[in-house]
């Protein structure tokens, strides 16, 4: 079997899909995308096509290493996202060719169902309690929301109190009947992160995500030493080499690589295993589309330290399409009590409605994240 062609499709709300075709008629799908940089990743995918077209798709490890090492310059968000989408499609092809789900190729199941959580609120968190009530009625008991709006490097007691009041209200309303993670989203500098963590501790969040930017990872051990809240990070780390440094330094209780950003299935299986060796949980980042979610689930199902899976149904970014709109076999992704069962179909287990995708590609949105500014006019972290 040989790879014959790579085709990309843009689709609402902010996704890029990749179709990899072979001379035996078996097709694989991937989702290579950086939110807000889809066209940059698309260009990288087609540059990398020269390394894979004409090659045997079953040699996934060799193709991965070739895409990564054949160029003198390597790594980073764009290239690793391009590799990720191609890698996902290669695993999809191999599973379909052998008639088994990808998790069987990775050693088989360690669990039957994977617990997921729902996003509530928005970029500037609001209406959280009402949304939690709606989703609890559907069986969900674990949620995540943004912890702050813009926050200056050194900010006021008022800014801290505004963040804490929201969390206090949620815990007061629901007691211990729900769990929630709080996403700082890299908006908080190290000085304020320490203050916020101290004030949030009484409300027992499940985790705090991106307490500081990945560029400030040296603060993770110091922040962890100041709080009992588990710290999570990883959506803006793109290879096992970046995770190696963080795991060696300590401080993170849960790693969150993105299967569409951090080299795909091949790389993230290694990251999960590295984290397990450090007694660190694995909870892939995935506010993306159905192929990315399927890839995450296959790694979750073979990783003993997988604890939670993000998924984007109803997330505030999904304008114009929701998670399963381009999926034919929606029933396989049905959540029961907040969990998704092992995907039964061969490959990644997601059947894409290509006709619908082609129509979406005719006039897709060119999504960009908001640009925020502080009151003094300086740019703020989004």
Swiss-Prot record:
Binds 1 Mg(2+) ion per subunit. The active site is at residues 185, 285. Its cofactor is Mg(2+). The keyword Translocase does not apply. GO terms for biological process: amino acid catabolic process; D-galactonate catabolic process. The record marks 310 as: Transition state stabilizer. Mg(2+) binds at residues 183, 209, 235. GO terms for molecular function: galactonate dehydratase activity; hydro-lyase activity; magnesium ion binding. SUPFAM superfamilies: Enolase C-terminal domain-like (SSF51604), Enolase N-terminal domain-like (SSF54826). Catalyzes the dehydration of D-galactonate to 2-keto-3-deoxy-D-galactonate. This is D-galactonate dehydratase. It comes from Xanthomonas campestris pv. campestris (strain ATCC 33913 / DSM 3586 / NCPPB 528 / LMG 568 / P 25). The gene is dgoD.
